[in-house]
C-alpha cells in the first residue's frame, strides 16, 4: 500500500519543465531549472514558492523538496504509479450504454435573449437498464465546480460511472455528460457560471423529455451540482433531487 504525495516532473518537447501534483489537483505548473550540471539538479516553482534540489545516484535522483520554510525528502525515479480502483465497473456490462449529444441553444426560450455562457453541445452517455421499458425513471448527473468529464473523474476515481453502474443494475437509467470544453462537449469553459451550468443541465432534462422514453426525471448533483439540482427543482424542471455534498446554507454563509 502506498502512502504519501505523488509528484511528477515532466520535461516537455520545447525544453520547458512542468510539475504535476495529482493528489492536490494541480497539473502543468511551470518550473524553472536553476541548475543542471553533472549529477546535480535544482528546480524552482515560483507559483508555489517551492524548490527541489537533488543528485543523481544510480537510477534515482535523491533530493529535498522545500516550500515556505518546510523541507522533506523527495526521491525521483522513472515509472508509473498505478492506483488500484476496484470499484470501477468492468465489462461485460449487464446494461446498454449509448453515446448521445444535446444542445444548449444559448437563447432564452421566452425572451429570445442570449443566456449566460452561450450555445454549446454537450456530449454524454445515456445508460439503459437491462430489459428497459418506457416509463422507467432516469437521473441526470451534474458535476461539481471545475470542468470535469462525464465520469466526474478525479485522481483516477470515476464516481459518476460507479453510480451509473449501480443505478442501471437496479432499474434506473442515467445521463452523464462532459462539462463545457471537456471531452466531446463544445463551449467556452472560461465563460462558465453556475447559471450557465444550470442551463446545460436543463438542456439535458429537455433532451430526456424529448425522447418520450422515461417517466420521472431526477437530478443527482455533486457539490456545486447539488446547488444546480435545487435551482432546477425550484423551476419545476425535475421530479426529484439527490444532493451529494451540496450546500444547505445560503452562499454568503458557506463562503
Residue ranges and their predicted role:
Residues 1-66, 87:
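Central antiparallel beta-sheet cores of small beta-barrel/beta-sandwich binding domains
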Residues 82-134:
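N-terminal cap/lid segment of alpha/beta-hydrolase-fold proteins
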Residues 135-144:
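Short beta-strand element of the alpha/beta-hydrolase
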Residues 149-162, 179:
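The serine-hydrolase catalytic nucleophile loop
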Residues 162-184:
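Conserved alpha/beta-hydrolase
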Residues 190-211:
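Alpha/beta-hydrolase active-site loop
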Residues 212-223:
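Alpha/beta-hydrolase fold nucleophile elbow
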Residues 242-252:
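Active-site nucleophile loop of the alpha/beta-hydrolase fold
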Amino acid at each position: 500500500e502506498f502512502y504519501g504525495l505523488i509528484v511528477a516532473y515532466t520535461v516537455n518537447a520545447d525544453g520547458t519543465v512542468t510539475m504535476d501534483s495529482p493528489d492536490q489537483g494541480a497539473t502543468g505548473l511551470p518550473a524553472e531549472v536553476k541548475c543542471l550540471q553533472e549529477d546535480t539538479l535544482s528546480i524552482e516553482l515560483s507559483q508555489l514558492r517551492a524548490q527541489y534540489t537533488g543528485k543523481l545516484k544510480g537510477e534515482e535522483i535523491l533530493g529535498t523538496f522545500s516550500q515556505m520554510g518546510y523541507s522533506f525528502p523527495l526521491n525521483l525515479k522513472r515509472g508509473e504509479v498505478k492506483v488500484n480502483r476496484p470499484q470501477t465497473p468492468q465489462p461485460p456490462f449487464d446494461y446498454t450504454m449509448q453515446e448521445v449529444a444535446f444542445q444548449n441553444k444559448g437563447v432564452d426560450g421566452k425572451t429570445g435573449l442570449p443566456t449566460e455562457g452561450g450555445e454549446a453541445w454537450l456530449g454524454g452517455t445515456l445508460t439503459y437498464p437491462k430489459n428497459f421499458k418506457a416509463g422507467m425513471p432516469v437521473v441526470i448527473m451534474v458535476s461539481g465546480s471545475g470542468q470535469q468529464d462525464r465520469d466526474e473523474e478525479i485522481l483516477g476515481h470515476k464516481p459518476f460511472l460507479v453510480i451509473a453502474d449501480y443505478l442501471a443494475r437496479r432499474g434506473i437509467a442515467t445521463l452523464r455528460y462532459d462539462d463545457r470544453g471537456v471531452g466531446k462537449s463544445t463551449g467556452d469553459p472560461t465563460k462558465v457560471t453556475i447559471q450557465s451550468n444550470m442551463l446545460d443541465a436543463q438542456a439535458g432534462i429537455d433532451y430526456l423529455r424529448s425522447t418520450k422514453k422515461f417517466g420521472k426525471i431526477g437530478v443527482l448533483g455533486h457539490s456545486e451540482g447539488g446547488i444546480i439540482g435545487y435551482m432546477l427543482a425550484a423551476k419545476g424542471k425535475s421530479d426529484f433531487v439527490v444532493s451529494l455534498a451540496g450546500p444547505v446554507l445560503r452562499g454568503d454563509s458557506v463562503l
